[in-house]
């Protein structure tokens, strides 16, 4: 799929999710000044994985997936069905850490967190795709005679 087509479906998924304007039934954690300072320090150290393993993020992530019926919203916009495995920050965490736990952007009312499948998340983050290299030749030859 061409990148432009994918971006169009992604924008459609955000519009649809925003129009539904659902909210989870349970109260969710908010980003306090202390949490924001901790997150900012983790991002500066390149350790965002610590944040993504936190209980606050886990609760918000599961609530978003329930809101989206555990479906990838981008695939749904394309007329396909894929289970959502990831919750994506529309405005990336590094750019807007204050929105880390916000389902909707408070400035615009647009969905900030959406459920996506692994493949769509990789399309959204092409810079993070791992480049797999073939295994290097062994240093010494082993022979099984």
List PLM regions with ranges.
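A boundary/linker detector
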Residues: 1-59, 76-81, 132-145
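Intrinsically disordered, low-complexity peptide-like regions
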Residues: 19, 87, 119, 123, ...
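A short linear-motif detector with a strong N-terminal bias
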Residues: 30, 51-52, 64-67, 93-95
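Short cysteine-rich loop/turn motifs with clustered Cys
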Residues: 56-91, 117-119
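Short Cys/His-centered divalent metal-binding micro-motifs
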Residues: 79-80, 110-137
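Short linker/helix segments within small regulatory modules
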Residues: 93-113
